[in-house]
Design a protein with these regions (language model features):
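Thiamine diphosphate
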Residues: 1-145, 211
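Glycine-rich ThDP/TPP pyrophosphate-binding loop and its adjacent helix/strand module
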Residues: 52-59, 63-65, 105-235
Length: 235
């Protein structure tokens, strides 16, 4: 298949995820819509083209991992996994209801395909880093992808993990920073400015930083992941 055809398929997949995300949140009547919507194109690229996963065997040891450190984007992950066949997508319409397998924040003990329970911001980044190190020590040829919010980057734990990942040369770890400019209490720059930018901080720790002009463009996201794959010795 030509690249242009692949990209068009990913755009369609992203639109399908958007629709299902809105249905999922709508079933509850409220939820984290913007924080879910802002990661959908990246999820479409990962699950539509990039990641090694098996819906029939969610715990396959050689799978790629995807961690939502910003766990409140759970509805987007549920829509993505449902469309990939991990479960009937309509099951997610029980979002945050009693006895549901789809809490508002992702939970690996409840939802097939979810690799890590998240919600307390910063901890997903740290655990994803540990998973990447563990996979490397075990000799697995896989990657760990982690989504971190720009507001989440106020957490010191994010930067401890960033330093750790660079020190141990975890080139099997790829971090997406969802730089959507807003967090719960308002504009990110008003709550806690990151000086020269979040990318500059990761660069200072020794990461290979790739900044996109449009984080909702599936082709730019796909190309960035390929560049990250080609980088050796740096997360």
């Amino acid at each position: 298949m030509q690249k242009a055809e692949k990209m068009q398929e990913l755009r369609v997949f992203a639109q399908e995820i958007r629709v299902e995300t809105l249905k999922t949140v709508g079933s509850l009547g409220f939820g984290h819509v913007p924080g879910a919507m802002s990661v959908i194109d990246a999820l479409a690229v990962l699950y539509g083209e990039v990641m090694k996963v098996d819906p029939k065997n969610p715990h396959w040891e050689d799978r790629d991992w995807c961690v939502l450190s910003k766990g409140h984007a759970g509805p987007a992950m549920y829509a993505t996994l449902g469309l990939k066949g991990f479960y009937p997508v309509e099951e997610a319409y029980t979002l945050n209801q009693p006895h549901t397998n789809f809490p508002s924040h992702t939970d690996r003990t409840k939802t097939p395909g979810v690799d890590l329970t998240t919600g307390s911001l910063g901890q997903g980044m740290s655990t994803a880093t540990g998973a990447a190190l563990g996979n490397k020590l075990d000799g697995r040829d896989n990657h760990v992808f982690v989504f971190v919010g720009d507001g989440e980057c106020d957490e010191g734990q994010v930067w401890e993990a960033a330093q750790f990942a660079a020190h141990y040369k975890l080139d099997n770890l790829i971090c997406f920073v969802d730089d959507n400019k807003y967090q719960l209490d308002g504009a990110v720059d008003k709550v806690m400015s990151h000086g020269k930018g979040i990318g500059a901080k990761f660069d200072a720790f020794g990461w290979n930083v790739i900044e996109l002009q449009d984080g909702n463009d599936v082709e730019q996201i796909y190309d960035a992941v390929q560049l990250a794959y080609d980088t050796k010795g740096k997360p």
